[in-house]
């Protein structure tokens, strides 16, 4: 759950991205902030709430991610699930409002999820 940018909760990692950020900034934030905390936590089950409104074609989040960025982060999470959770991972789909970009992003996510 969202608990604010400055949350001190141990189970929340908020890494705000500036409007207009692209996949490079997204990947850097994931690699430097989010994945180390996920690895340290070593979950026994991973739940993904996959939203795609950060796609560059979607005007909802003002970010510039592309399909490949969603596939990449999905692979990262799946790797962690293999390491700590015996592959136990569940994904649910959420937002994304530009339908063509949503379809491509969901396809990239599912392909990465299935390996």
Please annotate each region the language model reported.
Residues 55-58, 88, 98-102:
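Short active-site-adjacent structural elements
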Residues 1-76, 110-111:
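Conserved alpha-helical scaffold segments that buttress catalytic/binding sites
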Residues 66-67, 99-115:
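Short, electropositive alpha-helical surface patch
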Residues 22, 97-98:
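Glycine-/small-residue-rich active-site loops that bind phosphorylated ligands and cofactors
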Residues 81-88:
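A short helix->loop->beta-strand "cap" motif at the edges of active sites that frequently abuts
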